[in-house]
Amino acid sequence: MSHSKQSGTEAGSIPRVLISADRSSSGKTTISMGLMAALVSRGYKVQPFKVALDYIDPSYHTEITGRFCRNLDGYLMDENGILDVYSHACETGSGADIAIIEGVRGLYEGFEGLSDLGSTAQIAKILKCPVVFVINARSITRSAAALISGYKNFDPDVEIAGVILNNIGGRRHAQKAKEAIEHYTGVPVIGIIPRDPSMQISMRHLGLMPALEGRRRLGDGGFEDRLRGIEEIINKGIDVDRFLEIAGSAKSLTSPENSIFSPAAGAGSPRPRIGIALDEAFNFYYRDNIDLLELAGAEIVYFSPVNDPELPDVDGLYIGGGYPELFAAELEANESMRRSIKEASAAGMPIYAECGGLMYLTEKISTGVPGKGTYHDASMPESTYIMVGALPGHTIMGQTRVVSYNIGTLDRDCLIGKEGNSFKGHEFHHSEIREIPEYAEFAIALLRGTGIKGDRDGLIVGNTLGSYAHLHGVAYRELAGSLVEAAGKFRASRAPR
C-alpha cells in the first residue's frame, strides 16, 4: 500500500504516532531513531518530539531528521502550550509530513501515582495520537499478551494501535509472542526486532551520549555507519507501511489559542545580540527557547567556550547545560575565553547560565575524586580545573544524581524576570557547588527542588545569574522577553558601535 506525503497540510491534520513502552531500556529510543531514519530515506519530512525534558534523545532525533526535536511535558505545560509547541514545530520551515513522538519511561509513568499528569499517556490523549508499543520481549512469549492487555485496558482513552517486539531470540520466540498478543488483545504486531548489539547507543552518566559527542568520538563515518545499521535493522524488522497507516489514523487537532510563537510587539531593529554557547561541552537547549528569543527581538550568535579565543560582539550571553566536567581541561586551557566572559560579567553584560553553564561560571570544577559524596568515573581523571570565576563557589562532581522537577519564585528583579514571578522547571545533574561564601546572593526561592544551597537557586553577581533550574519558555513565558530586554538595555548603555 502506498502512502503519500502531506506537505503543506495544517499541523493538526498531519499523520502522527507516539512510540512508548512499559519501562525505560525497552528499546524505544533506538527504534524511534531507526523509524525516523527509514522515513527520511523515503523522502518524508519527519518532525520529531520527545515527551518530558530530556536533551539527549532529541539530539539524535534532530541529527537524523534535519528538523529540531521539540519537548512536550504535561507537568510544565498546559494543554494549550503542548498544542502550541506541536503546531509550531510541524509548521516550521516548509512543514512536516509526519510527526513521531518518543515517549518517556513507561506509558503511564508521570508526576503522580493516581493521575496521568506528566506522563506519556497524557501527551497521547492531548494530541489524539495512536500509540505503537515497544516490548522488551526477552525471555517472554505469552506473558507479552498479558502485558499488552493490561496496558490497553488500564486507560481506554489511550489507543494502543500496534506492537513492536524487541530483543527477540529467534523465529519460534517471535511466533509465540506474536500469536498470543494478536489473539488475546487484538492489537497487531507490526515489528519484530532481533537481539543485536548494534542497536545499542553509548551511555553517559546522565543517559545516552549526546549526538554531537557521539559523532566526535566515532568520527563522521563511524557515526553514520551506526545510524545506517540501525535503520537497516528497522527496515527488515518493522512493517513501515503499517506504521504509516497507524500514524494516518490520528484524529484532527484543534489549533492552539493565542500562540506564544508570535513576534513580540516592538521587536525590531536594533536587535540585541545574544551569544549562545554551543559546542561539545554546552549543547543542552530547548529549541523553543531559541525560537522565542528570536521572536522577542534577539539576534542569535553562536560561540564555543572550548574552541573560540574570545566572545563575539554580543549584548548578552546564554550558557546552557551540557558536560563541562568532561571537557574541563579544554575549558581551563582556553584562558582567553574565560577571561573574556569574566570581563563581560564585570562590565554588567547580562549572562544567564543553566546547570553546566552555572558550573563553568564558578571558580573551579573538581572531577573524578573518589570517596563519599563525590562522583567517580573512569572517563574523568581526578583533577581540579580553573573555570571562569564570574560566580563564587567550587563545583564538585557529586555521587547523588539529581533528577527532579522544581518550582521557584523570583524574590528580586533580575535578567530572567520580575520579583514575584514563579516558574516550574527541572534539575538534571551530578554536581554540587561548595565553598559558597556567606555573602553570596540568590535570586530564586525554591518551593520544590534541590537548587544550589538549601532552598535557594539562582546564584547572582551583578547581571550574571547561574541556576541549576532548566527553564522552558513555553512553561515560563517571561524568560525570553526578560533576557532580550536585559540585553537591549545593555546594548543601549554601551558606546555606539
Swiss-Prot record:
It catalyses: cob(II)yrinate + 2 L-glutamine + 2 ATP + 2 H2O = cob(II)yrinate a,c diamide + 2 L-glutamate + 2 ADP + 2 phosphate + 2 H(+); Ni-sirohydrochlorin + 2 L-glutamine + 2 ATP + 2 H2O = Ni-sirohydrochlorin a,c-diamide + 2 L-glutamate + 2 ADP + 2 phosphate + 2 H(+). GO terms for molecular function: ATP binding; cobyrinic acid a,c-diamide synthase activity. The keyword Magnesium applies. Residues 273-478 form the GATase cobBQ-type domain. Transmembrane segments: none annotated. Comprises of two domains. The C-terminal domain contains the binding site for glutamine and catalyzes the hydrolysis of this substrate to glutamate and ammonia. The N-terminal domain is anticipated to bind ATP, and cobyrinate or Ni-sirohydrochlorin, and catalyzes the ultimate synthesis of the diamide product. The ammonia produced via the glutaminase domain is probably translocated to the adjacent domain via a molecular tunnel, where it reacts with an activated intermediate. This is Cobyrinate a,c-diamide synthase. It comes from Methanosarcina acetivorans (strain ATCC 35395 / DSM 2834 / JCM 12185 / C2A). The lineage of its organism: Archaea, Methanobacteriati, Methanobacteriota, Stenosarchaea group, Methanomicrobia.
